[in-house]
Amino acid sequence: MTETGRTSKYRVEIQQMMFILGEVQDPLPETTQLVEELIRGQVMEMLIQANELALRRGSRSITVEDLFFLIRHDRAKVNRLKTYLSWKEVRKKAKEQDANPADTKDLFEEVDSKTRSMNAVAMPWEVKNMFTEPVPETEEFEEDNDTMEMAYATRQRLKMADERTKKMTREEYVHWSECRQASFTYRKGKRFREWCGMSILTDTRPDNDIVDILGFLTFEIVATLTEEALAVKDRMDRIQNSSGSGGSHAAHHPKNCSLFDGLTEGRTPLQVSHVLEAFRRLQIPDKTHTAMRSFHGGLVKSRVYLI
């Protein structure tokens, strides 16, 4: 039970997600609770903004395009979401064809076509969709900058995971694999709706696809917040070590540090201050996506920026 009286609903899932992203196996309870409250606020803000977009369109229902519009400035995240939706559709088709093994060849061909056309989801606000005639696509545009940016971010996470799992025992890797399956929405749709107050913030009940997308974006928020908090902690530790107040460098950074060593081998968990500083940094608006006010003056309403 928290200080505000709200019971944590995703403590275990958040611990598992933070663990695979670089945190120690057992984060501090107050840190986990803070992360849950922050991401809950982010999901609620996402629902509010998506509902406003739907009302502007004259609709009461949130669509997939509304959620895409909210993250349109993060091109790498947009492409990861497109990939997620493409493979989600493939898995759905695979379940439908389980009873007919003769269609396996067609399924593989569909998987290949889905992979090639995962970025073909039409977004009305994109320039290429503003022409009456479709822009012809060639091989030169198959791997654009957005796809390369998405691939780079994915490779960085895979590289970190490879380094952390390289010296694991079988039991440790089994635990790691179980943590990688953590989800906010898989078989937890009802809990997720209650957790973020979906029935209060939306006019109609969003379908399961919207809930799955929100679950994917919620994991992305946890990943971004955890990675930024670890960067803050690393910087603070280096400043402390360089000033001599934190002891020798070797004491805080042992050469042979296992993933499961925890506090006994010098690995310390994230503190609340690290998460708060990371959230503060992530709330600084990107100047490239900020409109000029032309010095008209007046009060500027503060808002929560989506991570």
UniProtKB/Swiss-Prot annotation:
<comment type="similarity">
    <text>Belongs to the SPT3 family.</text>
</comment>
<comment type="subunit">
    <text>Component of the 1.8 MDa SAGA (Spt-Ada-Gcn5 acetyltransferase) complex, which is composed of 19 subunits tra1, spt7, taf5, ngg1/ada3, sgf73, spt20, spt8, taf12, taf6, hfi1/ada1, ubp8, gcn5, ada2, spt3, sgf29, taf10, taf9, sgf11 and sus1.</text>
</comment>
<dbReference type="GO" id="GO:0005829">
    <property type="term" value="C:cytosol"/>
</dbReference>
<dbReference type="GO" id="GO:0006357">
    <property type="term" value="P:regulation of transcription by RNA polymerase II"/>
</dbReference>
<keyword id="KW-0805">Transcription regulation</keyword>
<dbReference type="GO" id="GO:0003713">
    <property type="term" value="F:transcription coactivator activity"/>
</dbReference>
<dbReference type="GO" id="GO:0000124">
    <property type="term" value="C:SAGA complex"/>
</dbReference>
<dbReference type="Pfam" id="PF02269">
    <property type="entry name" value="TFIID-18kDa"/>
</dbReference>
<dbReference type="GO" id="GO:0003712">
    <property type="term" value="F:transcription coregulator activity"/>
</dbReference>
<dbReference type="InterPro" id="IPR009072">
    <property type="entry name" value="Histone-fold"/>
</dbReference>
<keyword id="KW-0539">Nucleus</keyword>
<dbReference type="GO" id="GO:0045815">
    <property type="term" value="P:transcription initiation-coupled chromatin remodeling"/>
</dbReference>
<keyword id="KW-0804">Transcription</keyword>
<comment type="function">
    <text>Component of the transcription coactivator SAGA complex. SAGA acts as a general cofactor required for essentially all RNA polymerase II transcription. At the promoters, SAGA is required for transcription pre-initiation complex (PIC) recruitment. It influences RNA polymerase II transcriptional activity through different activities such as TBP interaction (via core/TAF module) and promoter selectivity, interaction with transcription activators (via Tra1/SPT module), and chromatin modification through histone acetylation (via HAT module) and deubiquitination (via DUB module).</text>
</comment>
<protein>
    <recommendedName>
        <fullName>SAGA complex subunit Spt3</fullName>
    </recommendedName>
</protein>
<keyword id="KW-0010">Activator</keyword>
<dbReference type="InterPro" id="IPR003195">
    <property type="entry name" value="TFIID_TAF13"/>
</dbReference>
<dbReference type="GO" id="GO:0046982">
    <property type="term" value="F:protein heterodimerization activity"/>
</dbReference>
<dbReference type="GO" id="GO:0005634">
    <property type="term" value="C:nucleus"/>
</dbReference>
